[in-house]
């Protein structure tokens, strides 16, 4: 539930507290399940 820079907290995304930055919008990262999936699986974790 804690953010790990540069990724935001999944919890904040799910409850609507996350506000996408200009770079997020430029990369077409929008609020929703897809962003949560990207946060969980989009880093070096995989």
Curated annotation (Swiss-Prot):
It comes from the Eukaryota. Pfam families: Glyco_hydro_19. Keywords: Carbohydrate metabolism, Chitin degradation, Chitin-binding, Glycosidase, Hydrolase, Plant defense, Polysaccharide degradation. Induction: By glucan and P.megasperma elicitors. GO terms for biological process: cell wall macromolecule catabolic process; chitin catabolic process; defense response; polysaccharide catabolic process. GO terms for molecular function: chitin binding; endochitinase activity. It catalyses: Random endo-hydrolysis of N-acetyl-beta-D-glucosaminide (1->4)-beta-linkages in chitin and chitodextrins. It is an enzyme of class 3 (hydrolase). Its EC number is 3.2.1.14. Defense against chitin-containing fungal and bacterial pathogens. Belongs to the glycosyl hydrolase 19 family. Chitinase class I subfamily. This is Endochitinase 2. It comes from Arachis hypogaea.
């Amino acid at each position: 539930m804690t953010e790990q820079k540069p990724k935001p907290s999944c919890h904040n995304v799910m409850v609507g507290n996350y506000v996408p930055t200009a770079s997020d919008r430029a990369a077409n990262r929008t609020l929703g399940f897809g962003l949560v999936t990207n946060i969980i699986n989009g880093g070096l974790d995989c």
